[in-house]
C-alpha cells in the first residue's frame, strides 16, 4: 500500500500529538534542583509543575483538554457562568491557543496532584487517569471539596484524596502546602443549569476554590488560580513571606470581568509583598488574548513613584523559571541551542560561504 493511502486521521493525530511528546517530561525528570532554589515549569493556562531542592514534584491545575472545536451549536450552554455574568446567548469563541507541552501518560515521578477549583480548565480526568495508572499508589489528590468530589466521581479512591480549605496545611516531603482564601467570584456563579443565582446569597467560596502557597526550602510560590483582585491579598502578604506570585491575567471581553487586568496584577504584587509577579492564563483562550508586556509597561511607569519591591516576569508555556536565579530577569526565551558551534570543523565549500 502506498504511504498516502496508509495514513489516516487517527495515525496523523497519534504521530503528532502531544506536540512536545515527552520532551518536557524528560527535562523535568533530569532537572537537579540546586539547594536554596526551586524550579517550576508553565504547563499552560494555570498549570504549574513545581520541583523542590529535595526532588519533590507537585503539579497544580494541569489541564489536558481543549476549547471550542466546532461552530455546530451557535448557543452557549444554558446556565453557563458566563451567561449568568453577562446575560449572553451566543457561543463563547474560546479556542485553545497553546500546544500540549507535557504528556500526562509519560509522568512517572510525582508526589501530589492539586487543583485550585473545579472549572474544566483547572482539573483534568486524563491527568487523574495517567497518575492512577502509571505512578505510585500513594500519590495524593489535593483540592477543595468540589475538586475532590470530581476526582472521586472519576474513580480516584476516596482515601487518595485530601480536602483542603483555607487555613489547612499539607506537607508533601519537603514542600509545605498552605491552602488560603480564594477570590474567584466566577466560581460562585458556576451552578447547575436549573439553579438560579439571582437574588440568592451564594454559598461559601471555601468548598469551591482555594489559593495555594507552596513553601519550599528554597523559597515560596503563591498560586492564585482564577482569583480576581481582592484586598485580602494584602492580608496574605502580611501573614506569609511570598517570593513568586502567579496571577490570572487576561483581556476581559465587553460585559465580562473574569481575569485580572495589568493594573490588578501590579496591585496583587504590591499587596502580597512579592518579589516577582508572573501572569498566566492569558495564553490559553483566544477570546481573552492579552499582551503581558502591558504589565511591564505599567510597572515601568509606576515603579519609582510607588517604590515597588517586585518585578514582573513574562513567561512562555513550557518554559522553566528558577527562583532565585531568574528573579532579575524580565522575560523568558526558549533555549536557542547551538551553544556548541565550531566544536567540530564545519563542512562548507569555502570559509566565507556563510
UniProtKB/Swiss-Prot annotation:
GO BP term, pick one: L-ascorbic acid catabolic process
Keyword Lipoprotein: no
Gene that specifies this protein: ulaG
First and last residue of the signal peptide: none
Keyword Cytoplasm in annotation: yes
Gene3D superfamilies reported in the protein's UniProt record: Ribonuclease Z/Hydroxyacylglutathione hydrolase-like
Key words, A-Z: Cytoplasm, Hydrolase
Superkingdom of origin organism: Bacteria
Similarity field: Belongs to the UlaG family.
Entry-linked PANTHER family: L-ASCORBATE-6-PHOSPHATE LACTONASE ULAG-RELATED (PTHR43546:SF9), UPF0173 METAL-DEPENDENT HYDROLASE MJ1163-RELATED (PTHR43546)
Organism of provenance: Shigella dysenteriae serotype 1 (strain Sd197)
Compartment(s) where it occurs, according to its Swiss-Prot or TrEMBL record: Cytoplasm
Protein name: Probable L-ascorbate-6-phosphate lactonase UlaG
Function comment: Probably catalyzes the hydrolysis of L-ascorbate-6-P into 3-keto-L-gulonate-6-P. Is essential for L-ascorbate utilization under anaerobic conditions.
Principal subcellular localisation of the protein: cytoplasm
GO molecular function: L-ascorbate 6-phosphate lactonase activity; manganese ion binding
Co-factor(s): a divalent metal cation
Catalytically driven reaction(s): L-ascorbate 6-phosphate + H2O = 3-dehydro-L-gulonate 6-phosphate
GO cellular component: cytoplasm
CDD domains to which the protein is assigned, alphabetical: UlaG-like_MBL-fold (cd16284)
NCBIfam families: PRK11709.1
Description of what induces expression: Induced by L-ascorbate. Repressed by UlaR.
Pathway involvement of the protein, from the record: Cofactor degradation; L-ascorbate degradation; D-xylulose 5-phosphate from L-ascorbate: step 1/4
The protein's Enzyme Commission number: 3.1.1.-
Amino acid at each position: 500500500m502506498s504511504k498516502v493511502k496508509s495514513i489516516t486521521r487517527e495515525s496523523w493525530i497519534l504521530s503528532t500529538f502531544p506536540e512536545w511528546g515527552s520532551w518536557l517530561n524528560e527535562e523535568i525528570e533530569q532537572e537537579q534542583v540546586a539547594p536554596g532554589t526551586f524550579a517550576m515549569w508553565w504547563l499552560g493556562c494555570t498549570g504549574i509543575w513545581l520541583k523542590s531542592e529535595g526532588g519533590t514534584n507537585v503539579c497544580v491545575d494541569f489541564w489536558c483538554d481543549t476549547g471550542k472545536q466546532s461552530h455546530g451549536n451557535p448557543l452557549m450552554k444554558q446556565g453557563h457562568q458566563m451567561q449568568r455574568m453577562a446575560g449572553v446567548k451566543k457561543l463563547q469563541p474560546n479556542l485553545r491557543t497553546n500546544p500540549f507541552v507535557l504528556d500526562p501518560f509519560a509522568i512517572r515521578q510525582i508526589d501530589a496532584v492539586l487543583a485550585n477549583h473545579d472549572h474544566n480548565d483547572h482539573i483534568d480526568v486524563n491527568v487523574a487517569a495517567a497518575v492512577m495508572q502509571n505512578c505510585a499508589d500513594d500519590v495524593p489528590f489535593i483540592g477543595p471539596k468540589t475538586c475532590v468530589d470530581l476526582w472521586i466521581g472519576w474513580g480516584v479512591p476516596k482515601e487518595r484524596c485530601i480536602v483542603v480549605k483555607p487555613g489547612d496545611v499539607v506537607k508533601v516531603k519537603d514542600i509545605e502546602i498552605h491552602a488560603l482564601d480564594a477570590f474567584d467570584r466566577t466560581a460562585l456563579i458556576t451552578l447547575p443549569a436549573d439553579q438560579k443565582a439571582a437574588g440568592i446569597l451564594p454559598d461559601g467560596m471555601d468548598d469551591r476554590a482555594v489559593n495555594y502557597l507552596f513553601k519550599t526550602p528554597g523559597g515560596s510560590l503563591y498560586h492564585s488560580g482564577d482569583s480576581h483582585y481582592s484586598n485580602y491579598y494584602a492580608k496574605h502578604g502580611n501573614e506569609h513571606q511570598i517570593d513568586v506570585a502567579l496571577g490570572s491575567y487576561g483581556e476581559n471581553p465587553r460585559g465580562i470581568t473574569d481575569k485580572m487586568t495589568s493594573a490588578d496584577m501590579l496591585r496583587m504584587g504590591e499587596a502580597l509583598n512579592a518579589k516577582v509577579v508572573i501572569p498566566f492564563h492569558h495564553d490559553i483562550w483566544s477570546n481573552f488574548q492579552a499582551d503581558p508586556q502591558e504589565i511591564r509597561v505599567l510597572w515601568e511607569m509606576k515603579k519609582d513613584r510607588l517604590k515597588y519591591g517586585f518585578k514582573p516576569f513574562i513567561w512562555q508555556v513550557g518554559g522553566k523559571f528558577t527562583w532565585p536565579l531568574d528573579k532579575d530577569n524580565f522575560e523568558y526565551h526558549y533555549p536557542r541551542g547551538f551553544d556548541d558551534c565550531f566544536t567540530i570543523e564545519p563542512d562548507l565549500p569555502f570559509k566565507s560561504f556563510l
